[in-house]
Amino acid sequence: MSAVKAARYGKDNVRVYKVHKDEKTGVQTVYEMTVCVLLEGEIETSYTKADNSVIVATDSIKNTIYITAKQNPVTPPELFGSILGTHFIEKYNHIHAAHVNIVCHRWTRMDIDGKPHPHSFIRDSEEKRNVQVDVVEGKGIDIKSSLSGLTVLKSTNSQFWGFLRDEYTTLKETWDRILSTDVDATWQWKNFSGLQEVRSHVPKFDATWATAREVTLKTFAEDNSASVQATMYKMAEQILARQQLIETVEYSLPNKHYFEIDLSWHKGLQNTGKNAEVFAPQSDPNGLIKCTVGRSSLKSKL
């Protein structure tokens, strides 16, 4: 005898663009995002008995995303995701959970002749702001915020030495190396009782995103890094200290390697050690370092 153990469905890759027009100043502000909504509830019969009566059509989910974006603010995305998820569990009695993922695409206002342009923008990087909102009936709202695709590099002030050495080790110790990574940072908010509580904390979502970004960049730049592990822990520690509603901070940092090129074969040209100026950036393989840091009162899952 078979039974459905878990099921969710919905609409993915819904692209949304919204413009806010200030009629007084003529300044326009744009937002672009990609949204995924997955629903859970009493939907087993759609799988086991071909009963479509319990299915909220994914096309209807798409339409709901557009209508909700028209009728509500789409920023901060934590609020928009909470409004959207709450709609589904309140509208449909048999739907008990809504999972909303939002990826915000970057549009930065252009500066023209030294002044911000009122309606022109540039995508100056592939950095993204993301949220995962889980609205569960009777259990409140869980929100994870994150930034990803923030590519950084520093040409010095990074070390790696004192690591375990055995018969598999060929890596040389170094007290000065290039450090580059694509930052993926996630912070888990405390559980919110419902949409009203989320609304009461709206200013903190943008402020915390800005704080996390600023802490990440400042620590990366200024820390004389003993390792990626040590630096990412310092980043997470500072974010937790600056926002008490955050329960955990998680970093995932690839270590993107830049190798010295030995050019001594060409007329004795010196390009290693202190003389290294030309390097070969490596696409793969790369290191990958992950860490979740929480408050000491929370149990570790190590």
Curated annotation (Swiss-Prot):
Keyword Oxidoreductase belongs to the record: yes
**UniProt-recorded Gene Ontology molecular function terms:** urate oxidase activity
The residues responsible for catalysis, as annotated, are 11, 58, 257
User: Per its UniProt entry, which superkingdom is the organism in?
Assistant: Eukaryota
Indicate where this protein resides in the cell.
Peroxisome
* EC number, as in UniProt: 1.7.3.3
Annotated binding of 5-hydroxyisourate, by residue: 58-59, 160, 177, 228-229, 255
Q: Which Gene3D superfamilies match?
A: Urate Oxidase
Temperature remarks: Optimum temperature is 30 degrees Celsius.
Alphabetized SUPFAM superfamilies for the sequence: Tetrahydrobiopterin biosynthesis enzymes-like (SSF55620)
Q: Which residues carry this modification: N-acetylserine?
A: 2
- Annotated residues that bind O2 are located at 58, 255
List keywords of the entry alphabetically. Answer: Acetylation, Oxidoreductase, Peroxisome, Purine metabolism
What do we know about how this protein assembles, alone or with others?
Answer: Homotetramer.
Regarding protein family, the annotation reads:
Belongs to the uricase family.
Name under which the protein is recorded: Uricase
Lineage runs: Eukaryota, Fungi, Dikarya, Ascomycota, Pezizomycotina
Q: What is the gene name? A: uaZ
